[in-house]
Curated annotation (Swiss-Prot):
Catalytic activity: DNA(n) + a 2'-deoxyribonucleoside 5'-triphosphate = DNA(n+1) + diphosphate
EC number: 2.7.7.49
Entry keyword annotation includes Glycoprotein: no
Taxonomic lineage of the native organism: Eukaryota, Sar, Alveolata, Ciliophora, Intramacronucleata
Enzyme class: transferase
Entry's localization field: Nucleus; Chromosome, Telomere
Function: Ribonucleoprotein DNA polymerase that catalyzes the de novo synthesis of telomeric simple sequence repeats. Subunit p95 contains some or all of the template-independent primer DNA-binding site termed the anchor site.
Residue ranges crossing the lipid bilayer per the database entry: none
Organism this protein belongs to: Tetrahymena thermophila
Biased composition (Basic and acidic residues): 474-486
GO molecular function, one term: DNA binding
Summary of subunit composition and partner proteins: Telomerase consist of two subunit, p80 and p95 that form a 1:1:1 complex with the 159 nt telomerase RNA.
Name of protein: Telomerase component p95
This protein's record includes keyword Kinase: no
Length: 872
């Protein structure tokens, strides 16, 4: 979650601490100014190089390429935008910084000139902070919000034709200063709205809700208001209208309002009020007039319609009233499901869209193309556009799936067809059609009724050998074709990715279909051969028959293939949530790895037992699994992670399928190394562990921490089943010795473990000796680098909380302690005088912080505040 959506944090209590906090952040902002200056100078240099290049190109070539000119122009505009953005950020930091410097006497030369000693300056600063404490806290805390707001660039005032996602093209701005809303109902005071409107008159975006006009008087009041707006002659970038299509007065008001608008670029018409069926017979002519007004608007560049499907025929009928010769329309989107419309109207609909001379983006929700003429008209339309988003729910049986995709740069294609329609030959023709689009950069395919064939174990092994041989020869100029493929069953899958690997410009590819071994093997080919692929996503359907283990799909080769990727980000997932695999590329040397495995996936264990990830470039890994069957699987998981030698961040969430039988019994697995294997990760800085623990596993964590001196953040979360009588002494002693430790988070909930009355006192003594006393010693004696201690425990006994508060109050260095919110509330309400005195002492020292306060150098824990977990 971005900073702008977070609750305002609160600084620690205590005037001296508040002063230190403000001064420390001031130094951070000063360093940011220098950073922005450097970045600004670099961008200026790049901008000058680009200008020089363009001038040389113009001098040397009288007939230079228009595309090159456009690319250079776009780059220059982007650089200029970034330079201006950095200027604004520098000015913002300077403005706040200079005010704080002046008010807090931070100018040493000025202090010497006025004869102020360091002690006098400190006293004056404390007095100022005490008098206006909230003011200076807010100055510091609001800086991140303002910088984030500036970094986002506000709303997009100009949209380029090259934008891929047509849905995003229609998004309304969220900048409160630049859009205004009108509500047409009986309670609206249009006089007040007009007064406010004329005072500002600088809105870029207009939102209108026409849903509650019940009487003619209300209609005429809104109509008079519409005609008054017409006199202002204002222009808008976006007009967003929400209308009730079940109300005739609202439909008429929509027409009158559209006629009152002189100039706007993007129009969204939708209906938040829906019903199962509409009867538009009485107002059909009115709807035709509305569509004629919309499509005849001379300034309109984008139209997004989300209207009832019953209005579709009136849209087609209105085409005879529309002259498109001078139309500026570039982007068109119809996001209503049209499965039940008259199929005879569809061919006229595509023919109507063909006539717009500047149309480049077409997005169409589910529509039946069951007539041959409709398919032919669709192909003619596809010849004109560069970006197409189509969902086809029916295709003529005689059509051979020969589409015209040659000119497309962006294609999102979904098929909702009967399995028998999409035959092997038709699928082959479709992929050959896509293959012809040499400039295609974005491709998304969804075959949600595609039925795959079963694959035998023998065939799997044979194809695995084929792919391995292919990978070994990938550096040759041409990859040899395999000769030993099994015949007909593998053809559709293998050819599928073979065709796509020839799309040399393809950067973003996503596919959703039924998975077979052939599809996985051909996926390997695609990843090996595609030189420009930057993003790949596979969502597959997988159903294993328990009685037929020979249908098992082997995932072994995919990890080996992905290990060799240098540029591509990969996402592989199952719709049922069985597996989700992500490898995110930041640049050529930084990757982020995320793997989620759930218990229904039978081959999860092979991921850890048979393969090591060995991603040499991976620096951040998050692995979540609820499918591990034994402690050996956890050990294998640790081994796989330890093979990523450059890891800096690790987040592990590992649970077992059947943990109940080992809850109260020792695991007794001395031969397993568990987390001790992390000793190999010499660059590891941040660790988060959430898995079942026994003393052996807990000791393995301590052993690897002893060898890894770069650890900055250590997070140990509670697993829902805990072992009794664990000793945390060694763990806290090891953490105490880490020289760069900045953050510790402990969530073990020991108080929730219950014992019989006979053993209660023994258990209480053990908790004090093996957990609370080592924790308090750690708090007292930790290194100066430790900033935050997160103690997330719902309930703590009075004796234990006293020891913790005493430790943080008497600690050798200044640390911050954050308690569980419920625990904090109970402490405030406590009638124990000793606890209240300790709380007061901690407040004066400024060591207790609220749950939602954010420390810039600390990682999110996901417990108190909703930060983006992808920071791991």
């Amino acid at each position: 979650m971005s900073r702008r959506n977070q609750k305002k944090p609160q600084a620690p209590i205590g005037n001296e601490t508040n002063l230190d906090f403000v001064l420390q952040n001031l130094e951070v902002y000063k360093s940011q100014i220098e950073h922005y200056k450097t970045q600004q100078q670099q961008i200026k240099e790049e901008d000058l190089k680009l200008l020089k290049f363009k001038n040389q190109d113009q001098d040397g070539n009288s007939g230079n390429d228009d595309d090159d000119e456009e690319n250079n122009s776009n780059k220059q505009q982007e650089l200029l935008r970034r330079v201006n953005q950095i200027k604004q950020q520098v000015q913002l930091i300077k403005k706040v910084g200079s005010k704080v410097e002046k008010d807090l006497n931070l100018n040493e030369d000025e202090n010497k000139k006025n004869g102020l000693s360091e002690q006098q300056v400190k006293e004056e600063q404390l007095r100022t902070i005490t008098e206006e404490q909230v003011k200076y806290q807010n100055l510091v805390f609001n800086m991140d919000y303002q910088l984030d707001l500036n970094e986002s660039g506000g709303h997009r005032r100009h949209r380029r034709e090259t934008d891929y996602d047509t849905e995003k093209w229609f998004e309304i701005s969220h900048d409160q200063k630049n859009y205004v809303s009108i509500y047409a109902n009986q309670k609206t005071s249009y006089c007040w709205w007009l007064k406010d409107y004329f005072n500002k008159n600088n809105y870029d975006h207009l939102n209108v809700s026409i849903n509650r006009l019940e009487t003619e008087a209300e209609f005429y009041a809104f109509d008079d208001f519409s005609q008054t707006i017409k006199l202002t002659n204002n222009s808008y970038q976006t007009v967003n209208i929400d209308v009730n299509f079940d109300n005739n007065l609202c439909i008429l008001a929509l027409l009158r309002f559209l006629l009152s608008l002189e100039r706007f670029n993007i129009l969204n018409i939708r209906s938040s009020y829906t019903r199962n069926q509409y009867n538009f017979e009485k107002i059909g002519e009115l709807l035709e007039t509305i569509f004629a007004v919309v499509f005849s608007h001379r300034h309109l560049q984008g139209i997004h319609l989300q209207v009832p499907c019953e209005a579709f025929q009136y849209l087609v009928n209105s085409s005879s009233q529309i002259s498109v010769k001078d139309s500026q329309l570039q982007v068109y989107s119809f996001s209503t499901d049209l499965k039940l419309v008259d199929t005879n109207k569809v061919q006229d609909y595509f023919k109507f869209l063909q006539e717009f001379p500047r149309l480049t983006h077409v997005s169409q929700q589910a529509i039946p193309v069951s007539a041959t003429n409709a398919v032919e008209n669709l192909n003619v339309l596809l010849k004109k556009v560069k970006h197409a988003n189509l969902n086809l729910v029916s295709i003529p049986t005689q059509f051979n799936f020969d589409f015209y995709f040659v000119n497309l740069q962006h294609l999102k294609l979904e098929f909702g067809l009967e399995p028998n329609i999409l035959t092997k030959q038709k699928l082959e023709n479709l992929l050959l059609s896509i293959k012809q689009s040499k400039n295609l950069k974005f491709l998304r395919l969804n075959f949600y009724t595609y039925v795959a064939q079963e694959t035998s174990r023998k065939q799997i092994l044979k194809q695995a050998t084929t792919i391995k041989n292919l990978k070994n020869n990938k550096n040759q100029e041409e990859t040899p074709e395999t000769k030993d493929e099994t015949p007909s069953e593998s053809t559709s899958g293998m050819k599928f990715f073979d065709h796509l690997s020839e799309l040399t410009e393809l950067e973003d590819f996503s596919v959703n279909l039924q998975a077979t071994q052939e599809i996985y093997d051909s996926l390997h080919k695609l990843l090996i051969r595609s030189t420009n692929l930057k993003k790949f996503k596979l969502s597959y359907k997988y159903e294993m028959e328990k009685s037929k283990m020979d249908t098992f799909i082997d995932l072994k080769n995919i990890y080996e293939t992905l290990n060799n990727l240098k540029r591509c980000s990969v996402n592989i997932s199952n719709p049922h949530g069985n597996i989700s695999y992500e490898l995110t590329n930041k640049d050529s040397t930084f990757y982020k790895f995320k793997l989620t495995l759930n218990q229904e996936l039978q081959h999860a264990k092979y991921t850890f037992k048979q393969n090591e990830f060995q991603f040499n470039n991976v620096k951040s890994a998050k692995i979540e699994s609820s499918s591990l069957e034994s402690l050996e699987d956890i050990d294998s998981l640790c081994k796989s992670i330890a093979s990523c030698k450059n890891l800096q961040n690790v987040n592990i969430i590992a649970s077992l399928l059947y943990p109940n039988n080992i809850q109260k019994n020792p695991f007794n697995k001395p031969n397993l190394l568990f987390f001790k294997q992390f000793e190999q990760l010499k660059n590891l800085e941040n660790v988060s562990i959430n898995c079942i623990l026994d003393q052996h596993i807990l000791n393995s964590i301590s052993e690897f921490l002893e060898k890894n001196k770069k650890i900055k953040a250590f997070i140990l979360k509670r697993y829902y089943l805990l072992q009794y009588y664990l000793d945390y002494t060694k763990l806290f002693k090891t953490l105490q010795q880490l020289p760069e430790l900045n953050q510790v988070y402990i969530n073990q909930q020991l108080e929730e473990l219950t014992v019989s009355e006979v053993h209660k006192q023994v258990w209480e003594n053990h908790k004090q000796k093996a957990f609370y006393e080592p924790l308090c010693e750690f708090i007292k004696e930790s290194s100066q680098t430790l900033q935050l201690i997160d103690f997330d425990q719902n309930t703590v006994s009075d004796d234990s909380i006293k020891k913790i508060l005493e430790s943080i109050s008497e600690s050798k260095y200044h640390h911050y302690l954050r308690l569980n919110p419920s625990q904090s509330s109970s402490l405030i309400k406590s009638e124990n005088e000793e606890i209240q005195e300790l709380l007061k002492a901690c407040d004066e020292k400024g060591v207790l912080v609220k749950a939602y306060y954010k420390f810039p150098l600390c990682l999110p824990t996901g417990t108190y505040y909703d930060y983006n977990s992808d920071r791991w």
